[in-house]
Amino acid sequence: MSSEYTIDGASDAQNRLVQEIADKFSITDEHLAEIAGEVHVYLTNGLRGDSEPKALPCRVSYIKAAITDDIRDAKKNQSIALGLTINTSAQRMKIASVKFTHASPDIINKQVFQMHNVAGATQMCEQAATHIAQFINTHDVVPTESRRIEPVPLGVTIDLALEETSKSGGRVTCDSRACAGFFRDVDIAQCLGAALLKQHLPVRVTSTTNCVISTMVAAQHHFPSTCTALILNRGINASYYESARKIPKISGSELGQSSARVAINTELAWFGEDSDILKPTMWDHRIDRESSNTGFHVFEKLVADKYLGEIVRNLVTDFMDAQLIFPRDADVSTFSEPYSFFSSYMTIIEDASSDLREVGDLLRAGFNVDASYVDRQIVRALCHIVAMRAARLVGAAVAGIIKKATEAMDSPEPAVISISGLLTEMNQPYVECTIDTAKLIAAKLELDEPVFNILGEDGYTVGAALSSFSK
């Protein structure tokens, strides 16, 4: 039995079940390399067309790798830009401003606004315009004397499937994720532009992107060589820069005939559909079966914050059913509630105290259970097993994307990847394992060792502002 998951003081039955679970969640390095290769196949097929089998959506953006030059020009001109993030449910938005000044740090302001009783796209955009006006006045973003000279560019970003219809416009494609229905087929730039005009605001929408694209742009501002971005939030997504001439599905367009490298929103959550390479466990199948989008976003359900805690809860309830954890007279009803074990609880894998006090405090406060030292070890082990499986899967997927991004370069060089999202601050072991795995599999694919940068929880609102400078 692996000593990594041997529980001190546990019975043979307890240790045996922990090890059985660890074995089922274990993935060899060779299998991870195969997964990376499959991701590469899915990307290649996705660039061919939207109806290809074994393909990721690979949504093409008008944002180009050369946006670093556009940002550099904006710095020279001491430009101002606004960024707007709209969340999936249209109940919350974040606004940011970026102002470049000579010989001093960039001036960045951020503010969150709540949306109320949004029943349609027009109402959403009108509320957004009102909040933008409030933001401009509160932070004095646009000096009064310059408001009649030139509109301030506004970049909009949203964490939904987005088809960019022009350099400034984009329509949300509501896929299997829950999103407000009125998003479907609405051109956000046109809708918001009309609302801004209605309020006589000196602001013009110049770009509309998915959050994973604006995250990559934000990363380029700090690390100009960035070619790939990974978001680890409630869901998962990744983007990279691809040679426009290597994208068959846009070959007849002006963009497809250019020499530019353009941003690709991979929609990585979809990976694994039409494939058996991921080999989900019975607990993963249970999560999928009980989800609102059964059969979709297969990869996301194995690795994303939204689902990791629920996988752990299902494992704990199996221990409960076998009467191998917690006192028999304990009230464990909370554990029976779906999604009651939040993924944020999995930070307990970092508890290094001799008695695992943090684990015990969590179980007492969150579930009203006085857990023994053995119980605490079991719960921490289950969190670690689930988190490390997820991190290794993500690392393998990133390696596959790195291979594709490297092939798109004019001259191959070490790939620079930025990671953003809640998990970068919430679960350091997860992020570290993701990076280590990506480097390991990249080496197996004979790629130069990639460079990783952590962008933090929210880079995409500032990235949206920077995207507005795109030419």
What are these regions (language model features)?
Residues 84-86, 96, 206-207, 219-220, ...:
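Conserved catalytic-core segments centered on acid/base and nucleophilic motifs
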Residues 96, 106-107, 145, 165-167, ...:
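Intrinsically disordered, low-complexity regions enriched in proline, serine, glycine
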